[in-house]
């Protein structure tokens, strides 16, 4: 293996007493928790795009980083160098998975033919890197939003030829994801929305994206891809309004096109913030609807209205997220991908490690707090008691469709006393959660 991060040894667990910034204090991959290794509960992944493709450019300034793998030269050779750097980073960070967009790992080229050739070359190289390091692919996806051709969307584009081009791109990346043993394939519609209703046919675009998703499902079975298909909700940015606004919106879309048993969701914390929801809300909603697939672990900024993609650092927030996931049985093919980037002023190579190490420890500590909540059982007991009336014969008959509205109304007329309002005890439960986290 090449050594581009020479001063960094493979990151290991040193415990809470460690002051080493290049060590885990809470993440012990082999620690057994509820009968499963910590690494198997969390299933961490590093993203290719923020760490190895972004050069520090923002809306108001040019690239602030001087990454040696981003210097000028032959695009395909630079992609090979970037793969060397990325896999050394994955290996030294000691995480099991990574994620990519197609053009993160292979140059797009000047034609579809050149794009397909470059993907083929890089898929062989990535396969070799995976075998060498033991790092696996959590998910792959096609970038159908950056190129100017996708300014008006990919599957929702009014130009049929652009729809076709996006279809070709997705076909190639699904094949590549299968070849590399990817456990999921993600569909994120960054441009699947509108800027103005004045030039938009909402019904037409909805039919287009619905048919596109149906074809993606068909193609999954055609090529024998065994992974999970995921949609990543986001309300806006880069478009004014995206059709995959939040988890509930995505579920309604899936139901409309008969896809609710075929596609799940990849939930990003910062996207929940932009939609006006808590991270826990989106995760809990997906679980309630049976469509939780995977997580993009990051954080936004409540004072800012855009996707800041910061590393997660709140144990308080993520303990409740991990509690929801544990209560639902944990991940199957999904995991925790750090869709996060260092700040533009964090220009040192080591900053990439610091950001991920802090995020990994945050999620590990959150897992431990979530286990306390689950094992103690007091929160579950309270919720069960609060809804206990629905376990009665009457409650079951209502939910099973055995009673009509007027029959329930007649039951209400037989009540001797008015129903009593009961305390929700939110403050007590908040205190209880704080004890699990901070005691």
UniProtKB/Swiss-Prot annotation:
Keywords assigned: Carbohydrate metabolism, Cytoplasm, Isomerase, Magnesium, Metal-binding, Xylose metabolism
Assigned GO CC terms: cytoplasm
Residues that bind Mg(2+) 1: 232, 268, 296, 339
Keyword Zinc applies: no
GO biological process per UniProt: D-xylose metabolic process
UniProt similarity note: Belongs to the xylose isomerase family.
Full protein name: Xylose isomerase
Organism, scientific name: Photorhabdus laumondii subsp. laumondii (strain DSM 15139 / CIP 105565 / TT01) (Photorhabdus luminescens subsp. laumondii)
């Amino acid at each position: 293996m090449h050594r581009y991060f020479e001063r960094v040894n493979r990151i290991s667990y040193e415990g809470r007493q460690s002051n080493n910034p290049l060590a885990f204090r809470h993440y012990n991959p082999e620690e057994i928790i509820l009968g499963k290794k910590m690494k198997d509960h969390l299933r961490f992944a590093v993203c290719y795009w923020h760490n190895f493709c972004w050069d520090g450019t923002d809306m108001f300034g040019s690239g602030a980083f001087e990454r040696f793998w981003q210097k000028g030269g032959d695009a395909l050779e630079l992609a090979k160098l970037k793969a060397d750097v990325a896999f050394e980073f994955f290996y030294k960070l000691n995480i099991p998975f990574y994620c990519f967009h197609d053009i993160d790992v292979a140059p797009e080229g000047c034609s579809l033919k050149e794009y397909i050739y470059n993907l083929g070359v890089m898929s062989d190289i990535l396969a070799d890197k995976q075998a060498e390091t033991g790092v696996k692919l959590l998910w792959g996806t096609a970038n159908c939003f950056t190129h100017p051709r996708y300014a008006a969307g990919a599957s929702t584009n009014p130009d049929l030829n652009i729809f076709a081009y996006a279809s070709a791109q997705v076909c190639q990346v699904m094949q590549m994801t299968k070849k590399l043993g990817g456990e999921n394939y993600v569909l994120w519609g960054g441009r699947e929305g509108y800027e103005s209703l004045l030039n938009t046919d909402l019904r037409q675009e909805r039919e287009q994206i619905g048919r596109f998703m149906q074809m993606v499902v068909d193609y999954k079975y055609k090529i024998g891809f065994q992974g999970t298909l995921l949609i990543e909700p986001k309300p806006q940015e880069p478009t004014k309004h995206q059709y995959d606004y939040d988890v509930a919106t995505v579920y309604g879309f899936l139901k409309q096109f008969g896809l609710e048993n075929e596609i799940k969701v990849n939930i990003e914390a910062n996207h929940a913030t932009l939609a006006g929801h808590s991270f826990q809300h989106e995760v809990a909603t997906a679980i309630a609807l049976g469509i939780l697939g995977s997580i993009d672990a990051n954080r936004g900024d409540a004072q800012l209205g855009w996707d800041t993609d910061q590393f997660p650092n709140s144990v308080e927030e993520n303990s409740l997220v991990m509690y929801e996931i544990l209560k639902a049985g944990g991940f199957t093919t999904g995991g925790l991908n750090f869709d996060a980037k260092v700040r533009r002023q964090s220009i040192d190579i080591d900053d990439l490690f610091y950001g991920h190490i802090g995020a990994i420890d945050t999620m590990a500590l959150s897992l431990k707090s979530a286990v306390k909540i689950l094992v103690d059982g007091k929160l579950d007991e309270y919720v069960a008691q609060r809804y206990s009336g629905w376990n009665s014969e009457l409650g079951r008959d209502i939910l099973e469709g055995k009673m009509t509205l007027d029959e329930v109304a007649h039951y209400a007329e037989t009540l001797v006393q008015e129903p009593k309002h009961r305390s929700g005890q939110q403050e007590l439960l908040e205190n209880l959660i704080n004890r699990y986290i901070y005691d």
